[in-house]
Amino acid sequence: MQDIYDLLSEGERVTLECKKATKGVPNSLWDTYSAFANTYGGTILLGVVEHMDEQNNTKRFEIVGVEDADKIRKDLWNTVNSREKVNINLLYDDDIQTIDIDGKKIIAINVPRADYTVRPVYINNNLSRGT
């Protein structure tokens, strides 16, 4: 739990993206997945809302949780393994974790940097999109 708060204390950046995702996997996740894979790698947190008007990073992020973590994880795996959505799956089992914070479940996805031999990572069968 403390690790998530430490991560959030620095705010969103090139290696951290937060998404509300209370009811499911947002389509914007895949743009972030490919961007992280093609650069430095990074962490995507589902179930966390960023309040852009808040300057204080300790108050800027709100843990809202996801409604059905198991379903979201299943959907994530199904989609990342679909060549129609993303050209390569870089994730291993340990890269997707469900974390309980104050009774709310968030999902942390660690996207590794893609090896140069498999870059660019792209989405929707479109080399010019999501790279």
What are these model-derived regions, one by one?
Residues M1-T131:
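Conserved N-terminal catalytic/coupling substructures associated with nucleotide/phosphate chemistry
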